[in-house]
Amino acid sequence: MADFKATYKLKTNPFRLTPATNPDELVWAGFKDVKEKFEKRIERSIRIPNSTLVLNWGEYGSGKTHAARLFNKKDILKTLAEKAGKTIPYSTVISLPKGKEPIYSIYISIIDKLNIEELRSTFSDIVGDVNTYIDSIGSNLHIQSVLKAVFNSDIQHLDIKKYLYGNMNATYLISLNASGILRSLKDDTDYSSILAGLFSCLTYNKQKYSCVILWIDEFEDIAVLNNANIDKTNNFIREILDNVPNNLLLFLNLTQSALISVEDLGQYVYESVKSRIKERISFDLPNPEIFKEYLRELIGLFREGTDDNPYFPFEENVINSLIIELGNVSLRQFNESLSMLLELSDMDEKCPINTEVFNSYKQEIIWHKD
């Protein structure tokens, strides 16, 4: 088999079928207007002390999860923060839970990613100010004590992590009594209050973190929850936005599916939440011009050496034929076909990929059209 890099002038196959999990492998190609909307929205939240709910809408495979992971990268966020002249955001990506206790699962997903040792180190020089601030938010003395314990280096970080997880038995709980923690966390109100308080502390005066960015991916799964859990999920979103009035940017990634469409949205996302949506970012199906721009940029990012043809190893007429054959489909479907076409050509040592090559594999690479 011929050397892939030398033959196809590509570092590797650029057509991913699923979003990368390694941040170093995440790149953005084309779709400049969508990228710009995210950059501007995040930059506004970095600059301005207000909380915002954004709905990201599109079909399966349109790039919502990819956007969440890319804009969760520290180097991307650092660049946006430097542009705004502020500190970096605290960002995390979770998926909407489908189990019996969605709020507890959301809470655990966020606590899983909370590095208490790192947090304490970051806030060590302003912990006194943070404690004073905690006294000013809400009236629940228990929640205030828990929040202070998170930032208190005198308490073992693993002990407070056990407590937050609910893994501390009554005997060990006694060790936290002196810090004002007299009971375990027990219900959705506790979990929501802890998260709201934590987010507010993280962004105190925008000194250490300019804002908290929370992405909830696969939000369309709300359609498979029972009515009680749909209520709980909507209440959580409403309460977290109300209780973190400053510096929270919440993205909901929603995929149009057989279970949920724009017309069905009101059945699952209540008016109390919809009324808080400040912006909708749509991931539309790409037209031929947008797709070809995306393809040129993507291939350029993976190019090994140079070539006068920006689509190489594909001839442009192959790209045009593929667009006609596939019709109006998602970016993922284009990527699937091009990935398979490239792999088959590599196996059979066919390069460049011209019309003859395309026609020989056409039945295999556009099987999903029917």
Label every model-predicted segment.
Residues 47-208, 331, 345-354, 359-369:
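P-loop NTPase nucleotide-binding core
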Residues 37, 66-71, 102-113, 233-236, ...:
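Alpha-helical scaffold elements adjacent to nucleotide-binding pockets in ATP/GTP-utilizing enzyme cores
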Residues 1-14, 18, 173-321:
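The catalytic "switch" region of P-loop NTPases
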Residues 43-46, 72, 199-203, 224-227, ...:
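Alpha-helical repeat scaffolds in large eukaryotic proteins
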Residues 1-54, 74-82, 354-370:
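A short, basic N-terminal segment
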Residues 289-293, 298-370:
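C-terminal alpha-helical "lid" subdomain
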Residues 49, 230-233, 327, 334:
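Active-site-proximal structural scaffolding
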